[in-house]
Amino acid sequence: MFGTIKKIIKDKGFGFITPDDGTDEVFFHRSRLSPKVYFEDLREGDEVQFDVRPGEKGPQAFNLRPR
């Protein structure tokens, strides 16, 4: 799946992605990034690729990487 990082909460270690397909925002956590992708390097507006799985409060991204 592809999308754009909408919001990053650096001090909490998570953020939200707006998927390109128009579906609901997807939560991501720093612990679910692809290897060699560093949370500190991510910026709002970055285009990313990711996989999605159901989470406790909605869809969650994992294997997050730059597009």
For each of these PLM feature ranges, what is it?
Residues 36-49:
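Short nucleic-acid-contacting surface segments enriched for D/E, G, S/T with interspersed K/R
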Residues 18, 51-54:
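Compositionally biased, low-complexity repeat tracts
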Residues 53-67:
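OB-fold/S1-family single-stranded nucleic acid-binding modules
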